[in-house]
């Protein structure tokens, strides 16, 4: 838009000069258009140079090897072949060679060394376009994004913007939960809740730590948009979509229901599988029933106390 305005401005100026001098019938005063053409050419060249070329990843007969082409289907990068690859996101494309993932730039040069067992694209999984997720020691029997293994976020130059966590969950709402553990999940029944030796915290979409890793359990694989039920020092509470406490971690158990989604922390964590006791009139949907010392307090999904239930 800036260059278009510039061109239109110079064209309008030239037309005004032309009309003025033609009216006076003094053609010798008409200024040549060459400077204007030069400025327009420079503007267009600068505009074109600022854009990345249109490059596309293709597969040979629908599988490996992968290669890249221009918009006309011509192979680029000297017919380079990769075991696997993804489309360019901005000026970076993830590629795999000799079993390791990294990133290349639009010239085909290595932008991030091929040294990871798996990586996502920049801006993927809800993260900012300036960061990408990388993993090592991925469990081949698990979907990579859900594999608990050394996981970090890197910038476009390959610098780590987070330490290696045991797990980084995709961004939900406004933060992504991370776990600083290394040992596998504490309990196969609770593999969506926590690690044996780590705790949960939160990073923002750019990878900045916004909530310290202090929660031993968190319900993450269950759809509860806007809040997350967590446990700290054996007590349950609720965080909002930014990872901030809206119900303090002082309760013995939590019950929540919406449609087919049911969270019953007492049934999930007790060996006997005993459920949270229902209040008079039963449980209502989209309310948080927090139990402490045999008494039940009720909260909305925003953390507001409900009375008279």
Features from the language model and the residues they span:
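Short intrinsically disordered, low-complexity coil segments enriched in acidic
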Residues: 1-6, 203
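Short, Lys/Arg-enriched N-terminal segments with co-localized hydrophobic residues
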Residues: 14-32
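Intrinsic disorder/low-complexity segments in short proteins, especially the signal peptide
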Residues: 11-13, 23, 43-47
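Sec-dependent N-terminal signal peptides
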Residues: 35-45
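Serine residues within intrinsically disordered or low-complexity segments
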Residues: 5, 9-11, 28, 46, ...
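Residue-level detector of conserved, function-critical positions
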Residues: 50-309
């Amino acid at each position: 838009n800036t260059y278009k305005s510039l061109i239109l401005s110079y064209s309008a100026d030239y037309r005004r000069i032309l009309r003025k001098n033609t009216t006076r019938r003094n053609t010798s005063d008409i200024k040549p258009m060459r400077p204007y053409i030069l400025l327009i050419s420079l503007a267009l060249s600068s505009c074109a140079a600022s854009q990345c070329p249109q490059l596309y990843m293709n597969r040979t007969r629908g599988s490996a090897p992968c290669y890249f082409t221009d918009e006309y289907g011509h192979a680029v990068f000297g017919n380079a072949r990769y075991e696997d690859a993804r489309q360019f996101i901005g000026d970076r494309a993830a590629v795999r060679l000799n079993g390791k993932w990294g990133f290349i730039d639009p010239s085909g040069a290595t932008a991030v060394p091929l040294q990871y067992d798996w990586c996502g694209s920049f801006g993927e999984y809800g993260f900012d376009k300036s960061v990408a997720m990388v993993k090592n020691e991925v469990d081949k029997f698990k979907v990579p994004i859900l594999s608990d293994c050394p996981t970090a976020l890197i910038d476009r130059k390959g610098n780590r913007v987070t330490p290696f966590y045991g797990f980084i969950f995709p961004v939900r709402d406004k933060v992504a939960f991370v776990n600083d553990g290394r040992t596998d999940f504490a309990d196969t029944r609770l593999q969506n809740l926590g690690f044996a030796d780590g705790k949960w915290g939160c990073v923002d979409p750019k990878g900045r730590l916004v909530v310290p890793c202090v929660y031993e359990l968190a319900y993450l694989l269950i759809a509860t948009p806007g809040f997350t039920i967590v446990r700290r020092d054996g007590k349950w509470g609720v965080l909002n979509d930014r990872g901030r406490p809206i119900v303090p971690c002082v309760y013995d158990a939590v019950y929540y229901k919406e449609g087919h989604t049911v969270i019953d922390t007492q049934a999930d964590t007790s060996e006997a599988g005993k459920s949270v006791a229902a209040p008079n009139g039963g449980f209502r949907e989209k309310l948080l029933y927090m139990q402490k010392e045999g008494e039940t307090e009720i909260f909305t999904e925003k953390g507001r106390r409900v009375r008279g239930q």
